Amino acid sequence: MAKSKAYRAAAEKIDLTKAYTASEAVELARETGSSKFDSTVEVALKLGVDPRKADQMVRGTVILPHGTGKTARVIVFATGPAAEAAIAAGADEVGGDELIEKVAGGYTSFDSAVSTPELMGKVGRLGKVLGPRGLMPNPKTGTVTPDVARAVSDIKGGKIEFRVDKHANVHFVVGKASFSPEQLSENVGAALEEIVRLKPSSSKGRYVQKATVSTTFGPGIPVDVNSI
């Protein structure tokens, strides 16, 4: 597929023979982002793990110090006092059986789902709807919890999830092109620190093998993995 004129113009600013530091890459990403809208800045990593092995599955969450630039839409499966707490924390939609039935019918107009442990027996049956979209609540990411208010606050405050795919790649958002270079660099640093902390003990050799920074529809900017 032919690349757009804007893409080609952005690509010309990038020296593909050079590996940029993370701070240089985010600065360049800001410069090469679309002038028509506030582009999302993303990071992609290739990790030295074998995702087929359970002990090498890298998955986690991190609260970006400057958020993502987008207010996440969060639904919560809860009843009683927990539901009231979720509403007070700013959840966009809260409910028990009725909300479960709504999602079972195909409703997915949200960015994250949280559930109390008590309702997971029912929520777990929504796997066909939530699973493929990465929206199924999970204790490992803090989205199955008695403290649903805290979960909502964290997500609204810039919490992101990351998970290695079957090709050992990890993709995550670190902000908008309108962020300052310092804000983007600090967000990238926070995410990378957590991903490096989660390196499986059974992973041998170089852990972060390749890294790129890009904006929406923009070219990937190679990052020197030694700077990570």
From Swiss-Prot:
Keywords: Repressor, Ribonucleoprotein, Ribosomal protein, RNA-binding, rRNA-binding, Translation regulation, tRNA-binding. Signal peptide: none annotated. One of its GO terms (molecular function) is rRNA binding. One of its GO terms (biological process) is translation. GO terms for cellular component: large ribosomal subunit. SUPFAM superfamilies: Ribosomal protein L1. InterPro entries: Ribosom_uL1_bac-type, Ribosomal_uL1, Ribosomal_uL1-like, Ribosomal_uL1/biogenesis, Ribosomal_uL1_3-a/b-sand, Ribosomal_uL1_CS. Pfam families: Ribosomal_L1. Binds directly to 23S rRNA. The L1 stalk is quite mobile in the ribosome, and is involved in E site tRNA release. Belongs to the universal ribosomal protein uL1 family. Part of the 50S ribosomal subunit. PANTHER family: 54S RIBOSOMAL PROTEIN L1, MITOCHONDRIAL, LARGE RIBOSOMAL SUBUNIT PROTEIN UL1M. This is Large ribosomal subunit protein uL1. The gene is rplA.
